[in-house]
Amino acid sequence: MKTTFKNIIRTIALTGSIVAVTSCPVYSAEYVSVTKDGVNVRTGPSTSNPVYMELFEGYPLKVVDKKGDWFKVTDFENDSGWVYSPLLEKRDNVIVNANSRANMRSGPSTGNAVVATLERGVVLELLERQGKWVEVRHASGTQGWIYAPLVWP
């Protein structure tokens, strides 16, 4: 009887552990973009916290924490702060993260023609990933391919 009771308790404890583990939130990298120009990044999750920097529409960010309606975010230079979440949305944008400039090409290879040269910090709409290349479109409408390690994320 004692052995059966111990087995039941052990089974309940194990089942509870499995439920507890599977119900824990799993955080994978979540990327968002700023919805309009002039969005403030603050030092804490409240409008009473000082503004750390101001961002423009489309700027991509990585969500690293959440507190109420606020997201703690980091950017491609690893600067971090808090943004009011309604000012962010899921959007496939990337930012040029090259040391100086990146060539946008007509196809996914260095053998293709350069269609534009982009400065560090230029935001682009991500259209497709193909191996180590990404197809992107600039707000001006210029479209092409960039070597993926030269953009973030």
Pin down the residues of each PLM region.
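Bacterial N-terminal signal peptides
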Residues: 11-23
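SH3-family beta-barrel domains
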Residues: 24-43, 53-57, 64-79, 83-106, ...
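Short, small/polar residue-rich loop motifs at catalytic or cofactor-binding pockets
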Residues: 47-48, 110-111
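Bacterial N-terminal signal peptides that target proteins for export
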Residues: 2-13
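Short, contiguous, well-ordered secondary-structure segments
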Residues: 1, 21, 25-26
